[in-house]
Amino acid sequence: MCQGALFLFNGGQPESRKNVQAVFWKQGNNPPFHFISCAEGNSGSRMRAGIVVDGKGQSRIWGDRIVIDWKEEAEKTYGFRVDVLRRGRGSWILETDLGLRLLKEYRGSVNRLEFEEAVLQSLDGMETLKADQYVRNSEGELLSTAEDGTRYIVKEWFADRECDLKDEREVLSAVRALALLHRQFRMIKRQETWNMRSMISLPLFEAMRRHNRELKKARTFIRGKRKKNEFELRVIGNFEIFAAQAVEAERGMEKLYEIHGKEIADGYAVCHGEPDYHHILIGNGYTAVTEFNQMHLGVQMEDLYYFLRKIMEKHDWNERLGRQVMESYERVLPVSEVERQGLYYLFLYPEKYWKQINFYYNANKAWVPAKSTEKIRKLEAQQEARESFIQTVIQGV
């Protein structure tokens, strides 16, 4: 009997090996598979799975539970030959006769896919900047449906590694790629069909206002607790400092929109939406930007803020590196005075602080993970360096 790997999914929620074994053993099956990750189906639902044996798919049906052979499914639907099938991050990586491909479940709309494809095709053919282009199936469709009803997409993929935020040369290459991406996206003519809610960004101060309300609710809750843990005590101790920055950022951003609203709206361009280092791959002579599922029309400075903040958190708000990042970006795409002001208020807003408190407030408040407490400690420790960076690098450049 062969040894393989069984993956079961139902909303991506992990379940114990014991529960999954019970499902199959109850039906008289004794598959010799090695369990890597799994999920138990809800009552009345059908369980979806994929089996890998020596890099190739195997299809089975146990009772009413369909097990999809993704190798066979991809070959049948897309017409290429799959030589190797392996797991990726929430996806399948396919080594095909046409090159590397990524297969992933998709839950959005076809209109959304068409929006992303139209934008990404503007990057097709560029030598130093690449993107994970969508691959249409044999019927010319972007979206495919497997036997069990799973909707999925296939994209071109890359074997390159993720950007190393500890490597300054790679960081500067990555931010240059982001600037090239933004410059190319500004050339794209907006289409009338790009009017879905997920495609257009709301004014940036609206999210700040919502987050500030959430901060106040969480602080009120913590104040009312008699016995407080370390996380809660630290929040009580540092809340006024971070809250003051949050309010100043919201008011400043709203005023910026009041004065320059038309200029900001006219300057809306396509944004990546989540330019994380996981989504920037360093290739041989090129940089690949991937995972555009958060792409939208909005303020591109939000992308730059997101990526630069991640870099600075890793480098303890190193001002020298921060200046180099800004210079690398502006050598490709200069930043206007209004954009710089918006970037200032984005950095002034204590987003990481809000995230930790919001996570606490919406989770099990009786037990706070040690990791959350450590993150609050780190935010406190980095606060002085963060403020200096904002004043000298962002506001003072």
What residue ranges belong to the model's regions?
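ATP/Mg2+ or Mg2+-diphosphate-binding catalytic cores
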Residues: W354-V397
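Juxta-kinase regulatory segment immediately upstream of eukaryotic protein kinase catalytic domains
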Residues: D54-Y78
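ATP-dependent phospho-/nucleotidyl transfer catalytic cores
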Residues: K104, W194-V270
